[in-house]
Amino acid sequence: MDELVKALERAGYLLTPSAYYLLVDHFKEGKFSLVELVKFAKSKGVFIIDGDLAYEFLQFLGLGVPQEIKESYISTGEEAEKTVESQETRASELEEGGVSQVSSGELQELKEESPEISTTEEEIGGLELVQSSISTGSEVEYNNGENGESVVVLDKYGYPILYAPEEIGEEKEYSKYEDVVIEWNPSVTPVQIEKNYEVKFDVRQVKLRPPKVKNGSGKEGEIIVEAYASLFKSRLSKLKRILRENPEISNVVDIGKLNYVSGDEEVTIIGLVNSKRETNRGLIFEVEDKTGIVKVFLPKDSEDYREAFKVLPDAVVAFKGFYSKKGIFFANKFYLPDVPLYRKQKPPLEEKVYAILISDIHVGSREFCEKAFLKFLEWLNGHVESKEEEEIVSRVKYLIIAGDVVDGIGIYPGQYSDLVIPDIFDQYEALANLLANVPEHITMFIGPGNHDAARPAIPQPEFYKEYAKPIYKLKNAIIISNPAVIRLHGRDFLIAHGRGIEDVVSFVPGLTHHKPGLPMVELLKMRHLAPTFGGKVPIAPDPEDLLVIEEVPDLVQMGHVHVYDAVVYRGVQLVNSATWQAQTEFQKMVNIVPTPAKVPVVDVESARVVKVLDFSGWC
């Protein structure tokens, strides 16, 4: 990765391709420093350094730009005005301490319901703001190399990649695993256990109606804004109901009615977190509901401070405290939707039954652990090495696959060179040929991920059938959405690919991809699979928020980050089911260490991981 791009990324700035080509030679020659460039961008109130800003910066330093480069990389006229307007808007949002989002001011409908309860920083008792350690993430520029131009994109871990048009080499020869045939070991007898499963929730079960616009000629942008308005209203309504089930939460008041509350009356407000800032005396939140917006101060000595510090933008939370007529809500308690401390126990099962959890197979990748996966298929067919494993495999009835089943096409710059199967149709055919070796008495549940042929934004209803047709034809396969809830013998398994982990890692200091169980716990506490709008995870403009965890599951399975982990939080088993892809060259460069070919075995009765199979020796 180029030194200039990487250094700016660490400083929280993005460099467009046009700016890169204007600046890189001067930077390498030592004609300016990174500090000078960052200070200049900061003075302009922008976080994206484009060609126009780069040219202005070079003029400021008295450095020339060749005419042919100037014509190629600097915009003029209307285009430049749009760029400045866009960046000024974004800078204004960042100064407010928030993340660019529809819910915090762009939705006119929400504004018109009640006037905002606003305040100024000076009114918060002279609290001195300090530089926040809470990252707001980075924007992603997706131009996909149109007209042969390079673009800056971020990979799944948030690192920028300089895109260059790929040169497609000679046609590749590859296997689609048509000759792979693995038969059941006749010396092992599968236990006859009646299957008991139900797809309790699937995105396709929900009939979503498009939002209404004021007139029949409504523009596409207006429709999308209305859809996001409906989405945030849906989220607030669902999570508010969950919060009100907490016996500690009482005397709930709408934000728009706080002016009618006496200063000595303790009340509770519930709303979306628009922004969060750290001060030398505590945290300042901007919280919004359908009736208004208010500033909330939580002191540093509060027992809930650490939990509040970890909350993500756009999460729904509750504060208990007192409202000042100066326009500040002084909180003494903070609540997340969270998981109840006590839940009703499920009745025991008559027979032991097991489920296998895997994800991120990445068929088609050069780093796909083919030998390890074949060994896994042999294991599923009873080719085991101990009596203990024989007892387990004879009782395995379910295989759950949580997305990224193939490596995909055009997912990231330069991917073609990383593929052994460069055809998306053939990738799914190869996958189907492999999964055809899963014994028929094992039911497979297969959902999509961001590498799959499916809607890029979450939730993902299913695979695109025209590409993934071969896996739809598997007799013992059930295609599910991302997310989905599967009920196995009365136990609820929440299955999601896990992209929301990215935002948690970006916003919460101390959490990493290397231990994904902890970010998964934070998502469960917030009862949402991807709370932050405008972060690293694209969220579809559906009129209902289907990413809310409305009912507490017995087990949560995710993947995406390629690292195995398993933790239990308040009786809920959380599992990240790792990957079947070995470490790629890019992962080596950024010190991402996957744990491939590790397979958790779950006892369905207890919904707990009881064994982890390790096939990494063949990877």
From Swiss-Prot:
Keyword check for Nuclease: yes
InterPro entries: Calcineurin-like_PHP_ApaH (IPR004843), DNA_pol_delta/II_ssu (IPR024826), Metallo-depent_PP-like (IPR029052), NA-bd_OB-fold (IPR012340), Pol2_small_arc (IPR011149), PolB_N (IPR054750)
Start and end residues of each stretch annotated as Disordered: 78-122
Position of the signal peptide: none
Gene3D superfamilies: 3.60.21.50, D-family DNA polymerase, DP1 subunit N-terminal domain, Nucleic acid-binding proteins
CDD domains, per database record: MPP_DNA_pol_II_small_archeal_C, PolII_SU_OBF
Reactions this protein catalyses: DNA(n) + a 2'-deoxyribonucleoside 5'-triphosphate = DNA(n+1) + diphosphate; Exonucleolytic cleavage in the 3'- to 5'-direction to yield nucleoside 5'-phosphates
Skewed-composition ranges (Basic and acidic residues): 79-93
Keyword Transmembrane: no
GO process annotations (BP): DNA catabolic process; DNA strand elongation involved in DNA replication
GO terms for MF: DNA binding; DNA-directed DNA polymerase activity; single-stranded DNA 3'-5' DNA exonuclease activity
Keyword terms, alphabetized: DNA replication, DNA-binding, DNA-directed DNA polymerase, Exonuclease, Hydrolase, Multifunctional enzyme, Nuclease, Nucleotidyltransferase, Transferase
Stated role: Possesses two activities: a DNA synthesis (polymerase) and an exonucleolytic activity that degrades single-stranded DNA in the 3' to 5' direction. Has a template-primer preference which is characteristic of a replicative DNA polymerase.
Subunit structure of this chain's protein: Heterodimer of a large subunit and a small subunit.
Family: Belongs to the DNA polymerase delta/II small subunit family.
Stated name of the protein: DNA polymerase II small subunit
Species the sequence originates in: Pyrococcus abyssi (strain GE5 / Orsay)
Gene transcribed to yield this protein: polB
